[in-house]
Amino acid sequence: MALTLDIVTPEKRVLSVQVDEVRAPGVQGGFGVRLNHEPFMTALEPGRLTYVEGGREHHYAVGGGFLQVADNRVIVLADTAEAAGEIDVDRARKAFEDAQNRLLQLTEQDEGHSAESARVRRAAARLTVAGR
């Protein structure tokens, strides 16, 4: 028996697979889910979502969202989700630099600061997952 992992974004169902374990970036810290985990739901931070399938790790960059665990099923409703091998590193690097430069022009009280900060975190997550 295994966990069912579904990753869904507003655009599409990204993934539906049987896995041994899921590790994700929760807003209160990273966590792991294995078979027969207690039900819960949490918000996700932009970061690396990892799942283990047959002893092999697979990595996705998620741009935040929510994760629910119930009945050996993990459902991820992500703002964005990209497999490590699908990330365009040059585009991610440019997005990171552009967002960082815009963020430097703002104070924490400025409108748009939190949105720009989130863009920096999403781009940083993509670069980290891509291994750059």
Curated annotation (Swiss-Prot):
Q: Where in the cell is it found?
A: Cell inner membrane
Q: Which InterPro entries match?
A: ATP_synth_F1_dsu/esu, ATP_synth_F1_dsu/esu_N, ATP_synth_F1_esu_C, ATPsynth_dsu/esu_N
Q: Which domain of life is it from?
A: Bacteria
> Where does the sequence pass through the membrane?
none
Q: Which GO terms describe its molecular function?
A: ATP binding; proton-transporting ATP synthase activity, rotational mechanism
Membrane topology category: Peripheral membrane protein
For this record, an example GO cellular component is:
plasma membrane
> Where is it predominantly found?
membrane
Q: Which Gene3D superfamilies match?
A: F0F1 ATP synthase delta/epsilon subunit, N-terminal
Give the keywords, sorted.
ATP synthesis, Cell inner membrane, Cell membrane, CF(1), Hydrogen ion transport, Ion transport, Membrane, Transport
Q: Which NCBIfam families match?
A: ATP_synt_epsi (TIGR01216), PRK13446.1 (NF009980)
The record's note on quaternary structure and interaction partners says: F-type ATPases have 2 components, CF(1) - the catalytic core - and CF(0) - the membrane proton channel. CF(1) has five subunits: alpha(3), beta(3), gamma(1), delta(1), epsilon(1). CF(0) has three main subunits: a, b and c.
Describe its function.
Produces ATP from ADP in the presence of a proton gradient across the membrane.
Q: Which PANTHER family match?
A: ATP SYNTHASE DELTA/EPSILON CHAIN, ATP SYNTHASE EPSILON CHAIN, CHLOROPLASTIC
Q: Which family does it belong to?
A: Belongs to the ATPase epsilon chain family.
Q: What protein name does the entry list?
A: ATP synthase epsilon chain
Species per Swiss-Prot/TrEMBL record? Anaeromyxobacter dehalogenans (strain 2CP-C)
The gene it comes from is atpC
